[in-house]
Amino acid sequence: MEKHILICGERGVGKSTLIRRLLAESTLPVGGFVTRRLTQADGDGMFPIYLHAAALPPEERPYDPEHLVGTCDSRRSIRYPEAFDRLGPPLLTSGGLLVMDELGFLENDAHLFQAAVLAALDGPVPVLAAIKPKETDFLRRVRQHPCGEVFYI
């Protein structure tokens, strides 16, 4: 089996851009998820982060409480692990290519989500993932997964 592609790098280096460009060249049906941090802060000065199906066109992605997985600013974050656990695992069960854009620290307590990610990495469906270079147990397990190859950008 070919190794899964795990792209690791700081915020803003182009992980998601690279994934979008690779997807544009692929003919495989896409599964998995994408997250998006809005550029407009909420009333508390926090930036909302949403999770959506990777196959859903950007203009069709709802930015509503159902898809909110957390908020953050430069110093703190509020996490909604139950949202990761509810939304994420079903998105990682089908597709010819599983996109995970991106894996980070907000899902530290989302154990069902983490298990689904690791199960996907154990599986035969190719994975294309963006990973924050943070030091958490979950992210270390993803980066060190024997079926993945990490590319640092």
Report the location of each language-model feature.
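Extreme N-terminal starter segment of soluble prokaryotic enzymes
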Residues: 1-4
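The conserved Walker
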Residues: 11
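N-terminal phosphate/diphosphate-binding loop that engages ATP/GTP or pyrophosphate donors
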Residues: 24-75
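Phosphate-binding/switch loop-helix module in NTP-utilizing enzymes
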Residues: 68-118
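Hydrophobic anchor at the beta1->P-loop junction of P-loop NTPases
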Residues: 7
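Conserved lysine of the Walker
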Residues: 15
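Post-Walker A alpha-helix
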Residues: 18-19
